Amino acid sequence: AFKRWEKQNGVEPRLPGIHLTHDQLFFLNYAQIWCGSMRPEDALSKVRSSVHSPGPIRVLGPLSNSYDFANAYKCSPGSRMNPLKKCSVW
């Protein structure tokens, strides 16, 4: 949807003092949603009892399998965030 909007309206200028592209800001915002910290024993308890993956997995899993993320951040092929073999749902 964002890319379609950009095509129709043009690319917005970057925010002053922010040295990230709009694509990078998109992924940064996604990651920040899942940002948090907890004590190791609480994390282990949550992993054992919750049906949902912990925040870091919700970020690293999808983004490391995203070609768009790898392009936005210029991740080297074969790196942790741009593995050569990716899992694709669609």
Kindly give the residue locations of the regions a language model identified.
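Zinc-dependent metallohydrolase catalytic domains
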Residues: 1-90
